[in-house]
Amino acid sequence: MIALRADVSALDPRALPELLRRLRRHRSVQVGECQWIAVLPGSGPVLLTSGDRLVLDLLIERRALLPVVIDALEAELRSGGFRERIALRWSTPDTVPVPLR
């Protein structure tokens, strides 16, 4: 399994609260004070952690699926008028957040 992380920063101060509300409309469960696991189209379960930025963590079976999952998540994150309101930074961290273990 490969850990994938998206750090989402706001270019508009209202963007992150609105984006988080939209993402939580998908089937989700709260797992911490500021954490939810949501099932997003094309990527499966994603850990959402809110704070001064929004962090999305997920696990992917094979490295070959990284571009497919990144494309699906970018499409989900940038839809609904968010294309110019957020900045995304992708990484593959060495550790997996506890709620995803």
Protein language model features and the residues they cover:
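A general secondary-structure signal for short beta-strands and their flanking turns/coil
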Residues: 1-3, 51-53, 83
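Short secondary-structure junctions
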Residues: 26-32, 80-85
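C-terminal structural segments of small proteins and small subunits
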Residues: 64-96
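Short, intrinsically disordered low-complexity segments
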Residues: 29-64
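Residues that cap or initiate secondary-structure elements
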Residues: 12-14, 44, 62-64, 94-96
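Polar/charged, Gly/Pro-rich intrinsically disordered segments
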Residues: 38-43, 93-101
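Hydrophobic residues positioned within well-ordered beta-strands of beta-sheet architectures
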Residues: 4-6, 54-56, 88
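Short glycine-/aliphatic-rich beta-strand segments at the starts of folded cytosolic domains
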Residues: 1-24
